[in-house]
Amino acid sequence: MTQIDNRFRRLSQALDYAFQKPELLRQALTHRSYSSANNERFEFVGDSILNYTVARMLYDQFPQLTEGELSRLRANLVNQNTLAEIAHELKLGDYLYLGEGELKSGGFNRPSILADALEATFAAVSFDADFAAAEQVVRRLYNQRVATIDTTRQAKDAKTRLQEALQARKLALPKYRILSQSGEAHEQWFKVECDLGEMALISTGDGGSRRAAEQQAAEAALTLLEQKLAASKKRS
């Protein structure tokens, strides 16, 4: 077993896939700050593999949903936050090759870098074997997530569900405010606040775009709202 094989042994076990050419996995985990032989082109292919596979899983799982509803479900499953969550589960950050600047700034834990590396990993599997092998890796990582989707909650995005929940109770609509914005133009990171003034509730969300951060903040606000309403109901 070569040194590179040994470095990726645990990751291969987590993916349930053994690379014949581990150098492909290494490139998938190499950020552009580390080398010109990086994962950007891999990410392009991996994104397509991911989107097709998740779309097919949703199509088979939910025959009753419309194209628009399936699209919203897929968007929630393939967004940066979900990909970063899966990458954390795989401990992908432990295997990244990053330049000195990215290392110092915590790039191994940055959602955008983790999400890109995971997509690039799907591409690496397809280059090492074929599309079917990459599809199986995606399916193994997403089976539980797809199986446990609550379509009554997920068919609409979080901002829409929050707005409808407030309107149903004749409450004021939420106010969103950017708390911080960092990173270079091509890799920005937003922190957003969601203020439910009448309910005295404030939540926050992070994301690679303002929209993604607002969606995460809205999801958190929904949870807080449900908890407060449930507590109020118990007291009455």
Curated annotation (Swiss-Prot):
Its main location: cytoplasm. Gene3D superfamilies: 3.30.160.20, Ribonuclease III domain. Residues 8-130 form the RNase III domain. It is found in: Cytoplasm. Keywords: Cytoplasm, Endonuclease, Hydrolase, Magnesium, Metal-binding, mRNA processing, Nuclease, RNA-binding, rRNA processing, rRNA-binding, tRNA processing. GO terms for cellular component: cytoplasm. It catalyses: Endonucleolytic cleavage to 5'-phosphomonoester. One of its GO terms (biological process) is rRNA processing. Mg(2+) binds at residues 43, 116, 119. It comes from the Bacteria. Residues 157-227 form the DRBM domain. Its EC number is 3.1.26.3. Its cofactor is Mg(2+). The active site is at 47, 119. Belongs to the ribonuclease III family. Digests double-stranded RNA. Involved in the processing of primary rRNA transcript to yield the immediate precursors to the large and small rRNAs (23S and 16S). Processes some mRNAs, and tRNAs when they are encoded in the rRNA operon. Processes pre-crRNA and tracrRNA of type II CRISPR loci if present in the organism. This is Ribonuclease 3. It comes from Chromobacterium violaceum (strain ATCC 12472 / DSM 30191 / JCM 1249 / CCUG 213 / NBRC 12614 / NCIMB 9131 / NCTC 9757 / MK). The lineage of its organism: Bacteria, Pseudomonadati, Pseudomonadota, Betaproteobacteria, Neisseriales. The gene is rnc.
